[in-house]
């Protein structure tokens, strides 16, 4: 039972939902609420009730039908919303996180079609500083998509079954633009090994045609010939992200490290964000009911540098409910660069700290 509770604690902030073992319908989700103290949000400190910072508020449906032999059909529909307002996180898509259908062979693998995230989220996010932790522990701007803000539309995904802990996959999102070659298409590859104490993952994504809020995220007002007004986006004709990470459990301690790299550009030029995340997850009492996460990160975007420290502690009240506290601090370097933890309004200077107390329930 204790091992199940520990697994649940980690899964509360992870990317995946356990697969159904037999025919049936699963309704699942997560709701999270807490109080944040923000040291500087646009020039002033503030206290606010925010939701979905431990893990996104969401609910979904997952179904599996046994077709006989080794074959099964499955589907997954998942919606993201804001608990404090009830609003959808996406104004244009109801099932914005997952909307897919597919066939699977338990011995070989699966084929999925629809709307779904890439392997940067599914294989890399479990190795990030945000698991266990808060969304503010992700890299500045989430350009590497560890937080699943961007999904592939019109996608076909092929993924192997798990063989002795190893699994791999490939995705292609069709641009559906006549006579325009690769316009708006998306491609991804991923591989992971998860067996015993060792977990290793690698992922790669290439997107032709994506907008990026470089002004809102980093304060950039002009990039490669594009003047970026407040609220306007940079139009990246090529957007590449890749990551490599690992974790290893040693008794009560699980150190982890993750490196990601993102390149965005157009016909004029390219710029990159380089990210390093490292930390250790601790089961301090050996009772599998408490988790502590200590981590740090360093990110560079052009001539801007962001250094970050993250502290997190949670206690499981049951298999589905936990209470937690978290502290995130970021310091920015670079001419005129301001700090901005992921998911919060930017600071007016080079430093920002967020302290949060909250609780989460999954179903």
Annotated model-derived regions:
Residues 16-21:
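Sec/Tat signal peptide C-region and signal peptidase I cleavage site
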Residues 22-37, 47-175, 183-185, 192-202:
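Outer membrane beta-barrel
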Residues 26-28, 72-74, 110-112, 167-169, ...:
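Residue-level detector of the transmembrane beta-barrel scaffold of outer-membrane proteins
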Residues 33-39, 79-83, 117-119, 172-176, ...:
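Transmembrane beta-strands of outer-membrane beta-barrel pores
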Residues 38-42, 84-88, 122-125, 168, ...:
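Outer-membrane beta-barrel proteins
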Residues 189-315, 361:
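Detector for outer-membrane/organellar transmembrane beta-barrel domains
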Residues 350-363:
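Outer-membrane beta-barrel "beta-signal"
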């Amino acid at each position: 039972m204790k091992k199940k509770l520990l697994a649940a604690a980690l899964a509360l902030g992870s990317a995946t939902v356990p697969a159904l073992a037999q025919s049936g319908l699963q309704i699942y989700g997560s709701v999270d609420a807490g109080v944040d103290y923000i040291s500087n949000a646009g020039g002033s400190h503030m206290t606010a009730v925010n939701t979905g910072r431990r893990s996104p508020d969401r609910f979904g449906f997952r179904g599996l039908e046994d077709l006989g032999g080794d074959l099964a059909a499955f589907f997954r529909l998942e919606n993201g919303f804001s608990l404090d307002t009830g609003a959808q996180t996406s104004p244009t898509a109801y099932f914005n996180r997952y909307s897919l259908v597919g066939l699977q062979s338990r011995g070989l693998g699966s084929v999925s079609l629809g709307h779904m995230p890439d392997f940067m989220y599914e294989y890399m996010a479990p190795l990030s500083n945000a698991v266990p932790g808060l969304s503010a522990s992700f890299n500045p701007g989430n350009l590497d998509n560890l937080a699943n803000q961007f999904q592939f539309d019109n996608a076909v995904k092929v993924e192997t079954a798990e063989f002795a802990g190893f699994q791999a996959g490939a995705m292609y999102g069709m641009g559906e633009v006549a006579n325009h070659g690769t316009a708006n298409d998306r491609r991804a590859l991923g591989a992971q090994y998860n067996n015993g104490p060792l977990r290793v993952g690698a992922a790669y994504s290439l997107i032709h045609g994506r907008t990026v809020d470089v002004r809102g995220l980093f304060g950039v007002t002009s990039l490669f010939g594009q003047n970026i007004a407040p609220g306007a986006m940079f139009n990246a004709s090529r957007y590449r992200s890749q990551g490599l990470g690992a974790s290893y459990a040693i008794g009560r301690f699980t150190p982890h490290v993750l490196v990601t790299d993102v390149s965005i550009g157009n016909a004029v030029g390219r710029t990159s964000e380089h990210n390093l995340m490292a930390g250790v997850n601790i089961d301090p009492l050996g009772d599998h009911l408490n988790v502590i996460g200590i981590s740090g990160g360093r990110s560079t975007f052009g001539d801007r540098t962001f250094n970050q420290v993250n502290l997190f502690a949670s206690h499981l009240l049951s298999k589905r409910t936990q209470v937690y506290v978290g502290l995130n601090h970021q310091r920015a370097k670079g001419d005129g660069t301001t700090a901005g933890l992921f998911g919060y309004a930017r600071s007016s200077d080079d430093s920002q700290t967020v302290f949060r107390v909250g609780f989460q329930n999954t179903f």
